């Protein structure tokens, strides 16, 4: 039997996000988030779904951590809800919010599970959106203040931190496409958000160095594997643009090299703040690791009539329930590419997974062989990247639980644990048992 063994100490994890699983968004003195107001506005989310209940993790957190323990998973990546901690975004700290996350952190540590905390996974306090949110330069100060509260309260026990989850999605899907909160469609606002996200990230890293002496901090990006529709120069250039704009370079180029990538500047210089370069020296704060999220690949071509002159070409490939093409070698490509381009000291796959139309069978189980196949193929490609020298230190499945999939509501299931939303019953899917075995063996059996 051929076993693909991972390095000793490799961290196998599962991931979630606050608004997607917690429910009870206003409980115990929490403030409103932009996802609360956005999802409560008719037409924004499929079927009118909201995160009011979600997986009720706010009340069932203990049961959910017991599932992680039972599966033998070694790390749990979760996010903290900014408005639970600072209901107005700044100023008054809500002790009951701190208490909730303290219970989670302490329980994880008791069970030998390493917490990876995401400081911001999209649920901005609505009070700050009223002041302009990510488009307001002051948000770097607000974010630094919020981060300091987290580091001072949790930094004694939490040693692995992520400043931002997928800042491209925050800026572009939230402020240009209008599909995510706050639901804006303004390219100038979107690129100001890109810039302010970088400034906020750097400020948080700076505060981290002052407050947590023995931890690591990084940032997480969404990535696609873009391939050209032909060998034509214009299609190859379209791929380069998509990589620089859509993937990690949009943010890592400023962090490592002090400017936005070349093709992004060509496209977006006029949308960025006039004197954006004045901020670049502070943006270049050193980070300890890069987190990459990867789900899918895309065939792209030059299209003179499309925004940014790029459009997607559909391929006859297997797809997930999201309609995303399954291209496992993309995870290998993105890992190799980040090493080649920026050579970060450590890399994590902070999300990888798939939505399928899962059903509970008559035997009470969820037989999601398609998800097992997806995970196995991607983990195998990640293993290959390690063999070729990529400093990959861990892998997190998205997600532990089926949950509120943003604008798709509850219609898309990503979990390795099934959630029956009418009863909140949890059922470990076949993929959950399979993944448990991968963790136990620290590798894949062919």
From Swiss-Prot:
Gene Ontology molecular function: beta-glucosidase activity
Residues spanning the membrane: none
Pathway membership: Glycan metabolism; cellulose degradation
Signal peptide residues on this chain, from the entry's feature table: none
Active site (UniProt): 166 (proton donor), 351 (nucleophile)
EC number: 3.2.1.21
Pfam families: Glyco_hydro_1 (PF00232)
Record keywords, A-Z: Carbohydrate metabolism, Cellulose degradation, Glycosidase, Hydrolase, Polysaccharide degradation
Recorded catalytic activity of this chain's protein: Hydrolysis of terminal, non-reducing beta-D-glucosyl residues with release of beta-D-glucose
GO biological processes: cellulose catabolic process
Similarity annotation: Belongs to the glycosyl hydrolase 1 family.
UniProt-listed NCBIfam families: BGL
Name of the protein this chain belongs to: Beta-glucosidase A
Record organism: Thermotoga maritima (strain ATCC 43589 / DSM 3109 / JCM 10099 / NBRC 100826 / MSB8)
